[in-house]
Amino acid sequence: MSAKTYNAGVKEYRHTYWEPHYNVQDTDILACFKIVPQPGVDREEAAAAVAAESSTGTWTTVWTDLLTDLDYYKGRSYRIEDVPGDDSSFYAFIAYPIDLFEEGSVVNVLTSLTGNVFGFKAVRSLRLEDVRFPIAYVKTCGGPPNGIQVERDILNKYGRAYLGCTIKPKLGLSAKNYGRAVYECLRGGLDFTKDDENVNSQPFMRWRQRFDFVMEAIHKAERETGERKGHYLNVTAPTPEEMFKRAEYAKELKAPIIMHDYIAGGFCANTGLANWCRDNGILLHIHRAMHAVIDRNPHHGIHFRVLAKMLRLSGGDHLHSGTVVGKLEGDREATLGWIDIMRDSFIKEDRSRGIMFDQDWGSMPGVVPVASGGIHVWHMPALVTIFGDDACLQFGGGTLGHPWGNAAGAAANRVALEACVEARNRGVPIEKEGKAILTEAAKHSPELKIAMETWKEIKFEFDTVDKLDVAHK
C-alpha cells in the first residue's frame, strides 16, 4: 500500500467528490438535491461542493484527512440530471455511506444533509427533493408507535376513513367551553376532535384543565354513542420534561391519543415522545406546523416528502398531509406520492409524482395521513377518492360552521362520508357522481342538506406555488 501524502492548499471539490462512475451500494443513504449554482460555478463543481459540505469536506485540504479513510466516509455526487422546464437548476444525486450517521437519529441525518451546506456560497439556492433510506438504516429507527392496523384495532373502526375536527376558535375559549365543543362534535358522529397546533397552555386555558374537561366530554360521548372516541391532546411544551409531564397526565386520564408539533417541537423531542407512546400504548398525532417555511419555496429548503419520511422514521401515527382540495398548498400528484410514502411498505421511483428513489420500509408500520384545512361536505367525494380508507378527514370550520351547531355539522360529515363509501363500494365513480350521491343522501339528512346549502359556493381555486417539476414541461 502506497504511503499517503499531504498536499496543502485549496483544490476543486470535483477532484474528490464527483464520481460519475460510482456503483451505488444497497446500504448507502441517497439524496437528490435541486441546485441553482452561482454564476461561474459549473454543475459538476456545485454538485461536488454539496457532497463535500454535507459529508467530510471543508474549504481547504487538511492534514487530518490522512488519519482516516476519507475515500470510505465521503459523500459522492454520482449523477446530474436536468430539471424539466427549468434551465436555471439541476438535480444532483449524492450517495452517503451509512456509517456517516448515528443509528436511529433523524436529528443527525438532518444535521448533515440540511446543515451548513444550505448556506454555502457556491450555490445560489438548494433544495432537498428526496432521500432514500436503506433498509439497514430503517431498521435502526423506532418508527410509528402503533401503526395503522393497531389503531384500527384499538378503536374498533374499519372500512372507512376517520372523521375529525379542530376545535375553533383555536384560541380564547375557556377549558369548560372547549370541552363542551368537543362533546357536541363527538356525539354528532366524529371519531376525533383536535387541539389546534398553537393550543398549549395559555392564560385563558391551562393544559391540565383542558385535559380534564376534554376527557369528561370523551367519556360522555362514548357512553351515548357506543363508539370509541378521541381528542388529540397537544402535549407540545417549552421543554421535554414538561412535554412528558403532560403526556403522563393524559395517560392517567386514559386518553387514547396525544399530539405533538413535530417540526416546531423538534425531532429529538418527537422521537422521545414516540418511544414513550409505544411503551404506553397511546396513539400519537403529529401536526406539521412550520412546514411551509421549509418546503413551500420550489428552489430552496426541504420538500415535504422528505419531512414525511423523517417523521415516519422518528415516529408518529398520524401526520397532516394536505388536502389537495382545501385551502392549503398541495399539488395532487405530489400529495398522492407522499401519502404512499407515509402508508405503504414499498414505494417505487415515480418521477410523475416527484418520487426520485425506491423506498423500502420493511416491516415498519405506516402513518395515517390527515387531510385538514378548508374542507367541507362538498369535498367529501374527492377526499374519499384521494385518501381512501386509511386516513383521517378533519373538518374544522366544515363542522363548527354548520348553522345548526357542532353536532349537526358532525352528523352532516358522517352521513356524507358513509354515503360516499357505500357508493364507492358499489363501483360508482364517486368523484364524478359526487353531487348526485350527496343530494340523494341529503334527502334523509336535514343536517347534510343545510351543510350543502351553506357551503355550495365556497372554493379555494388558487394555483399551487410548489408544482411538480414534471408539470413544468
From Swiss-Prot:
Query: Known Pfam families for this protein?
Result: RuBisCO_large, RuBisCO_large_N
Q: Single Gene Ontology BP term?
A: reductive pentose-phosphate cycle
- Name the cofactor(s): Mg(2+)
Task: Show the GO MF annotations.
Answer: magnesium ion binding; monooxygenase activity; ribulose-bisphosphate carboxylase activity
The UniProt catalytic activity note for this protein reads: 2 (2R)-3-phosphoglycerate + 2 H(+) = D-ribulose 1,5-bisphosphate + CO2 + H2O; D-ribulose 1,5-bisphosphate + O2 = 2-phosphoglycolate + (2R)-3-phosphoglycerate + 2 H(+)
As a miscellaneous remark, the entry gives: The basic functional RuBisCO is composed of a large chain homodimer in a 'head-to-tail' conformation. In form I RuBisCO this homodimer is arranged in a barrel-like tetramer with the small subunits forming a tetrameric 'cap' on each end of the 'barrel'.
Q: How does it assemble?
A: Heterohexadecamer of 8 large chains and 8 small chains.
Know the name of this protein?
Ribulose bisphosphate carboxylase large chain
> In the record, what lineage is assigned to the organism producing the protein?
Bacteria, Pseudomonadati, Pseudomonadota, Betaproteobacteria, Nitrosomonadales
